[in-house]
C-alpha cells in the first residue's frame, strides 16, 4: 500500500540535513547513507549518494526521473549470475545407446 498523501514523503532527518548542508556550501561530495528507505526528494537532484546494499556502498547519482522513488531501488542487494543452459546440457546424462 502506498503512503498517505497527507503525511508526505519520508526521508531520514540526518539525510536531509546532509543534503541541505551540501546545497548551502555548493559541495557535490558523495553522501554516504544506510537509509535505503528514504524517498528521493527534489533537493537530492544532482547529488551522488553512496547507498549501502548490505555488503558495500553503491554510488547512485540522482536525476530528475528518480524523484519519488526510494534510494534502495537503485542499489540492488542480490547478484544474479544467470542460468547456464550449456552446463546443464553437458552434465545431464542422455539415454543409453546400444
From Swiss-Prot:
Name used for this protein in its record: Small ribosomal subunit protein uS19
Keywords of the record: Ribonucleoprotein, Ribosomal protein, RNA-binding, rRNA-binding
Organism: Anaeromyxobacter dehalogenans (strain 2CP-C)
PANTHER family linked: RIBOSOMAL PROTEIN S19P FAMILY MEMBER (PTHR11880), SMALL RIBOSOMAL SUBUNIT PROTEIN US19M (PTHR11880:SF8)
Stated family: Belongs to the universal ribosomal protein uS19 family.
GO BP annotation list: ribosomal small subunit assembly; translation
Taxonomic lineage of the native organism: Bacteria, Pseudomonadati, Myxococcota, Myxococcia, Myxococcales
Sequence segments annotated as region (Disordered): 1-30, 78-98
Origin: domain of life: Bacteria
Keyword Lipid metabolism listed: no
Claim: rRNA-binding is one of the keywords in the record: yes
Disulfide topology: none
UniProt feature, compositional bias: Basic and acidic residues: 9-24
Listed InterPro entries: Ribosomal_uS19 (IPR002222), Ribosomal_uS19_bac-type (IPR005732), Ribosomal_uS19_CS (IPR020934), Ribosomal_uS19_SF (IPR023575)
Amino acid at each position: 500500500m502506498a503512503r498517505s498523501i497527507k503525511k508526505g514523503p519520508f526521508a531520514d532527518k540526518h539525510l536531509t540535513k546532509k543534503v541541505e548542508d551540501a546545497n548551502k556550501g555548493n559541495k557535490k561530495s558523495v553522501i554516504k547513507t544506510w537509509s535505503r528507505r528514504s524517498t528521493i526528494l527534489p533537493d537530492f537532484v544532482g547529488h551522488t549518494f553512496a547507498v549501502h546494499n548490505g555488503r558495500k556502498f553503491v554510488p547512485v547519482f540522482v536525476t530528475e526521473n528518480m524523484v519519488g522513488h526510494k534510494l534502495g531501488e537503485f542499489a540492488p542487494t542480490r547478484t544474479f549470475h544467470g542460468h547456464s543452459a550449456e552446463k546443464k546440457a553437458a552434465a545431464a546424462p542422455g539415454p543409453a545407446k546400444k
